[in-house]
Each structure stands twice: as C-alpha cells, then as structure tokens.
Curated annotation (Swiss-Prot):
A GO MF label: cyanate hydratase activity
Enzyme class, spelled out: lyase
PANTHER family: CYANATE HYDRATASE
Example of a GO biological process term: cyanate metabolic process
Domain of life: Eukaryota
Gene3D superfamilies: Cyanate lyase, C-terminal domain, lambda repressor-like DNA-binding domains
Protein family: Belongs to the cyanase family.
Gene coding for it: cyn1
Keywords in alphabetical order: Lyase
Family matches, as InterPro entries: Cro/C1-type_HTH, Cyanase, Cyanate_lyase_C, Cyanate_lyase_C_sf, Lambda_DNA-bd_dom_sf
Catalytic activity: cyanate + hydrogencarbonate + 3 H(+) = NH4(+) + 2 CO2
Annotated source species: Pyrenophora tritici-repentis (strain Pt-1C-BFP)
Enzyme Commission number, as recorded: 4.2.1.104
Annotated protein name in UniProt: Cyanate hydratase
Role description: Catalyzes the reaction of cyanate with bicarbonate to produce ammonia and carbon dioxide.
Length: 162
C-alpha cells in the first residue's frame, strides 16, 4: 500500500485562519502525523479533526488534552488558542479555486436539484442538518482503480407550519 504525504497548511490560507491553525499544523508536520492517526488518539473522526485544525469546529476540553498529548503542544497555550466559537465558512472563496474543493462544489451544482427532489420525496418538506451531522471519507479499490467514498449523514429537519 502506497503511503501518501501528510496534509500540511497552505500558507495562503493563514490570514483567514485562527492562531491555533499554524500551531496545530506545525506540530502535525513535525510529528509527521496524519489526521487519521490524530483522530484515533483523540477519539474523533478524521474529518472532524481536520475541521478543528482549520478552525471550522469547536474543541472540547478532552479534545485539547488529547491534542496536547499527541502533538506535544502546551495544553494551556492550546486551550487559549482554541477558546471561543469557530468562524465557520471563512476559509473559502466562492466558487472555490482549489480543484479538489471545486469538485465538491461542482457535485452540488450538477446534482443539487436532484438531491433536493429525492430528499423531499423520501422525507417531505425540510432540510438536512449540517449541525446534527456527521461525515466520513473512505477509500475503496477495485479493478478500475481507487475511489473516494464520501458519506454525509444529517438529521432531517422538517419545516414547521406557523
């Protein structure tokens, strides 16, 4: 199985990120740890950990303790940097410029109306929550190559009549 390099921080993003992001990414790079390895230690999903690194998720006291342990970062400094509410959605231009992120945007452009129609047929008038939500990424391999499998799981929230 081929080992791929770990994800590091794109310096162009730094002005849009909280102070914790460079701290976390520098320690991740120094230790040569994947998000998967960090997530296993913390006890969370790797996408949740990556979101935390980019300032898009809130860290619990337990998350901070575990991150401090695995990354050898002072817990007090990490707690100070990770306190407060995340400024979600602040890292992206729309439409996105990065090809990987643009493909996700393109999926919504191409299939968004179809997703909406099928969701409404299955659940009724409402929306899928991105708050009561989880996601995961899996790698599948078959005779045609490697495939990315992204699962989105959100609670269905029916619109209220008033």
């Amino acid at each position: 199985m081929a080992q791929h390099p770990i994800a590091t921080l794109n310096e162009e993003l730094v002005p849009r990120l909280p102070p914790s992001s460079p701290t976390l990414f520098e320690a991740k790079k120094k230790k040569n740890l994947s998000f998967e390895a960090i997530a296993k230690h913390v006890g969370r999903d790797e996408v949740a950990i990556a979101a935390l690194f980019y300032g898009q998720a809130m860290a619990s006291a337990q998350d901070i303790k575990k991150l401090s342990e695995i990354l050898d970062i002072d817990a007090g400094m990490l707690e100070s940097q990770l306190s407060g509410f995340p400024n979600r959605g602040s890292t992206l231009d729309m439409p996105p410029k990065d090809p990987t992120i643009y493909r996700l945007y393109e999926i919504v452009q191409n299939y968004g109306q179809a997703y909406k129609a099928v969701l409404h047929e299955k659940f009724g008038d409402g929306i899928m929550s991105a708050i009561s939500f989880s996601t995961k990424i899996e790698k599948e391999t078959d005779d045609k190559g490697e495939w990315a499998k992204i699962t989105l799981r959100g609670k269905w929230l029916p619109y209220s009549r008033f």
